[in-house]
Design a protein with these regions (language model features):
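A preference for well-ordered globular domain cores
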Residues: 1-168
Length: 168
């Protein structure tokens, strides 16, 4: 359970609250009840709704807590990642938020492409047996299937929208 200290706005776990109370000459207690929290000037932080990603690049990330109209505190989630302009340092050049986002998307695309290619390679390996001379299969159908697997990286939706061919 997470708890928010009213006087500081600090959010902590229950064990941290117990240590905080002890370090600040506060009380000790067995069970954390509403009465205990009120005496400590603290509130429970409830789990808020996750943000809903709209594409392959986004994810739900926590960004603090917020209070609702009834006064209860909830975890706050936003869509990430969040990019901001970064000034140059001694070791790295300045980078705009747009440049960071483009690099992030390129990295995500490359990782996804590698995963799809790995899956495609495994499917090709799994069907190698169909190409031996004495395999009791329709060689033309299996050859077409294997060619369709090789063509996966040329599909319009690659690497995120793949139409996998059906095995013969």
């Amino acid at each position: 359970m997470e708890i928010r200290i009213r006087s500081t706005g600090q959010v902590m776990l229950e064990d941290e609250l117990r240590r905080w109370a002890k370090d600040n000459n506060g009380p000790s207690w067995d069970r954390t009840t509403d009465d205990v929290l009120e005496a400590l000037g603290a509130d429970v932080v409830f789990e808020g709704p996750q943000a809903t990603p709209e594409n392959h690049y986004q994810f739900s990330m926590r960004q603090g807590v917020e209070q609702d109209a009834s006064g209860r505190w909830f975890t706050k989630y936003v869509l990430g990642p969040i990019f901001t302009d970064r000034p140059a340092t001694e070791t790295e050049p300045a980078q705009t938020a747009a440049e960071q986002e483009a690099a992030y998307k390129a990295q995500k695309d490359a990782t996804q492409a590698e995963s799809v290619r790995s899956q495609r390679t495994q499917l090709l390996k799994d069907s190698d047996w169909t190409q031996v001379a004495d395999a009791p299969v329709d060689k033309t159908a299996w050859a077409a299937y294997r060619q369709a697997l090789r063509d996966v990286p040329t599909q319009a939706g690659f690497p995120w929208g793949i139409q996998w061919p059906d095995k013969p």
